[in-house]
């Protein structure tokens, strides 16, 4: 017989196995935050939940339960059960949850059982799962094992991290490259979803028993995704390794990241004409995003250089002229800012080297 309730002692394995989850909360609750392996098949829609909530406040629990049954009955009830059945048939090992593991979980489980399926619900619901993940991010195992990968803009930190098993890629989780030019076409996750995904990544890292958790040197905000405060504070005190790269390689990498790859993404999504226009708008918006730091005169120089590069690109099908403004941005903005920031934390630097020597040093550290 299938167990009726999944206890908190199994939360770690639930996330590590990416167990299929059926979230029976209302869509508005799901949108604010959920888990990567969850789908939203609500017991009550937003309007139904709101009516039941109002009834509960005014008339109490018994009246609210009666109203809930009245709202979700007949054809509506059959449709909800049919959606659950379809999901369970596709993933028979699914678990379900509501917000606290209370009436919504129990009622959904009962209706599903009456339809011929027997699946458990999660003890404590979403709130308990969320608390578990927050505790992972605040655990001493996570906070005391960090090693920070730093390096100048364009040094290839993200490419490097993706080759390291002991790394967690914060920018990938945030769906943002971290700089003014880091915005992607697809939206960033909600703050709660970002934190949940980060916690699961840290949990996965802990099962590998690495000595260090390798992270890229990030600001508190990655786009609009904020790192958890305790997690970020630990990053600010962790040891650092510096990834070095020659200037020409940095320029070519940024030409690909800021221009060639980004242009291809816009064109693929929007078509040639609309994609090119959106790409130009993206470059101008990215520069305007740091206009206070650049100053009006330098900003205008960069915008003019971008305009020339775009015109040359259109007429000659050649993006190389973009190297002019990228080079200016590096030498007059990014590099001085990085050098100043590094001067404040030199005492934390353990090692510096190019990609090959950094890999070798980290491999030795793991022994």
From Swiss-Prot:
Subunit-structure text: Monomer.
InterPro entries: Rhodanese-like_dom, Rhodanese-like_dom_sf, SelU
Descriptive protein name: tRNA 2-selenouridine synthase
Domain Rhodanese: 15-138
SMART domains in the cross-refs: RHOD
Keyword Thylakoid: no
Function: Involved in the post-transcriptional modification of the uridine at the wobble position (U34) of tRNA(Lys), tRNA(Glu) and tRNA(Gln). Catalyzes the conversion of 2-thiouridine (S2U-RNA) to 2-selenouridine (Se2U-RNA). Acts in a two-step process involving geranylation of 2-thiouridine (S2U) to S-geranyl-2-thiouridine (geS2U) and subsequent selenation of the latter derivative to 2-selenouridine (Se2U) in the tRNA chain.
Keywords from the UniProt entry: Selenium, Transferase
Family: Belongs to the SelU family.
Top EC class, one word: transferase
Domain of life of the organism encoding this protein: Bacteria
Annotated active site: 98 (s-selanylcysteine intermediate)
UniProt-listed GO biological process terms: tRNA wobble uridine modification
Reaction it catalyzes: 5-methylaminomethyl-2-thiouridine(34) in tRNA + selenophosphate + (2E)-geranyl diphosphate + H2O + H(+) = 5-methylaminomethyl-2-selenouridine(34) in tRNA + (2E)-thiogeraniol + phosphate + diphosphate; 5-methylaminomethyl-2-thiouridine(34) in tRNA + (2E)-geranyl diphosphate = 5-methylaminomethyl-S-(2E)-geranyl-thiouridine(34) in tRNA + diphosphate; 5-methylaminomethyl-S-(2E)-geranyl-thiouridine(34) in tRNA + selenophosphate + H(+) = 5-methylaminomethyl-2-(Se-phospho)selenouridine(34) in tRNA + (2E)-thiogeraniol; 5-methylaminomethyl-2-(Se-phospho)selenouridine(34) in tRNA + H2O = 5-methylaminomethyl-2-selenouridine(34) in tRNA + phosphate
